[in-house]
């Protein structure tokens, strides 16, 4: 009778009450139970008060109750009916599996993005290459045009230059100049540099010398023939002095160029006269004189070294950009673009 009464009384008590009574009979506190079961004191208190924490899954709660029952020596079979009521098994909400189509769509989108990125890069590289090629082609065409123009001008200049020796030869055949005057002309001609202005400067004194040489014999008597060479010597010295003065004046604006490679060049002075236009070969030298300022067009700035008024001209900014150099050299040697 007592056993049945005890059994009925245990069934009437809830799971939490039975666990609390068993704990108190063993003289354990909630803190001690929590330490042995590695639980929080609040979790032990909720179990004894038959509370199911919302943040705790029913599976874990049933496991904690069974561990608590073994600790206080209560058979688990006696607690099963109460467990079904206190911690019923609740089906967990399983999120539906996402289909692989989402991953495929994302992968496809990434593929399109990469394709578009590569396409943009190819377009940028292509446009850059086309821009560079157009600039390079334009420079080559400009150089070709300059070379053609210089060749045509040189041919025209050659035709006009060939007519000069014919005129001088005819003049020499018509004039009866004495023999001593010929060395004076050749000496004056060799003393002056082969430049357009210098040649023009030297020709005028030479012509004066020829006129003086022609007049002197006509006015002199036969008895004074010995004085004619002295007069001729005086007249010959005059063009030499004039050539020296012209040379010193020209040297003030002298333009000296040394070439380390083949280079196209065009030089124009202040009057618009082209002092030179054409190709210069490697290891060539060019000395020009004219009226400053000079305007220069250089096809290959890296292939030429320029000295103006005895000072070097800086072409580094044209060499870095690898472009046709267009500059002006004024009297103060300040090259300008």
UniProtKB/Swiss-Prot annotation:
Residues 19-71 form the HTH cro/C1-type domain. It is a single-pass type II membrane protein. Its main location: membrane. Residues 1-111 are cytoplasmic. One of its GO terms (molecular function) is DNA binding. The chain crosses the membrane at residues 112-132. SMART domains: HTH_XRE. Keywords: Cell inner membrane, Cell membrane, Cell shape, DNA-binding, Membrane, Signal-anchor, Transmembrane, Transmembrane helix. Residues 133-337 are periplasmic. InterPro entries: Bact_Cytoskel_RodZ (IPR050400), Cro/C1-type_HTH (IPR001387), Lambda_DNA-bd_dom_sf (IPR010982), RodZ (IPR023690), RodZ-like_C (IPR025194). It is found in: Cell inner membrane. Residues 193-217 have a biased composition (Low complexity). Residues 160-192 have a biased composition (Polar residues). PANTHER family: CYTOSKELETON PROTEIN RODZ, PTHR34475. The helix-turn-helix (HTH) motif in the cytoplasmic domain of the N-terminus is involved in the formation of spirals to maintain the rigid rod shape. As this protein is anchored in the cytoplasmic membrane, the HTH motif may contribute to protein-protein interactions to form the RodZ helix, which is localized beneath the cytoplasmic membrane. The C-terminal domain may be critical for determination of the rod shape by probably interacting with enzymes required for synthesis of the peptidoglycan layer, including PBPs in the periplasm. Cytoskeletal protein that is involved in cell-shape control through regulation of the length of the long axis. This is Cytoskeleton protein RodZ. It comes from Citrobacter koseri (strain ATCC BAA-895 / CDC 4225-83 / SGSC4696). The gene is rodZ.
